[in-house]
Amino acid sequence: MALSFREFHLFQILNGFSQENKRFPLDRYLSHYFRRHRAVGSKDRRMIADTVYDLIRWRAPLDHFSIYPPTWESRYFVYSQTAWRERAQAASLPPHIALSFPQSYYSFLVAALGREKAEEFCALSNESAPTVVRVNGLKTTRENLLKSWERLYPVSPTSHSPWGIRFHKKVNFFAMKEFKEGLFEIQDEGSQLLADLMEVEPGDQVLDYCSGSGGKTLAFACRMQKRGQIYLHDKRKEILAEAKKRLRRAGVQNAQLLCYDDPKKGQLKHTMDWVLVDLPCSGSGTLRRNPDMKWKFQREELEQLLAEQRNIFKEALTFLKPKGKIVYGTCSVFPQENEDQAAYFQKHLSLSLERLFQTFPLHEGMDGFFGARLTF
């Protein structure tokens, strides 16, 4: 059977993404795909992206109702039958299938969170994530952007972050003049609040140890008013190249990039006023944006992650000066990666806890983030 234009790109995305590195985020993959395929218009992009997310989110019941071996084509065949949701609701399905989670992941969540909270979490993880941006305080104010946008888009200020604006419909942000001018960045409200644990001041020396492309640095940089120095450290040179573009667009001038093998690192030991360690984690708090992660979950890998998190934190701690402050962060809801790790750092590294921060995915609310601010 011949495929429609949308179906062709749908299967190109699904099959191509399935072959990518298992830690490559779905939202980033979609953005890159559509940038490479300019012929896909905005309406088609929305429809294709929504279908991609639905097929990945609801993989378990789609496979359950299919009479064919599990493929993206067989799942799409069931998905195209409008009554599949009603069938799923009417059938007495095992809870992990009804909630569309691997049985091992569902069982782990029940053990970690309790059955009621685990099932609430699973249901919320199958919803669409809210669309939130963070205003760049180096270039404008939230009031100015709200005033400019409210005539064009359904927008509202976020309830908790003083820098956030929520969009109530999908928008191609990358095409907006304000984005190209660096007036805002796309960032979940919970991520903005995690960055607020970094109460940096002008003149401080700051290290973002697992910086990625610099999202958290961009969030706290305006506090420094272009005075002091921020170091963005990551082991991936290509992601630091992306950080360089974002810093330039945002007008952050007091930042340097450090790859893991940079010889300058040794000179920075015990000199930082602030260190942020936004660690590699399970990503369980962001499954609405990256539902593929639930199908890749393995308990053995989580155990390896916990050990890796402790090792990275210990490395980052060597850059903190006496009386400096270090912020540990994840985008996870698992206590093993959050409260348990913070307790380990206090017990074994002679640190004192100053502040804990946590968000849990809520209906139309923030993603799941955790942060702990500690000091000697």
Give the residues covered by each predicted segment.
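S-adenosylmethionine
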Residues: 1-376
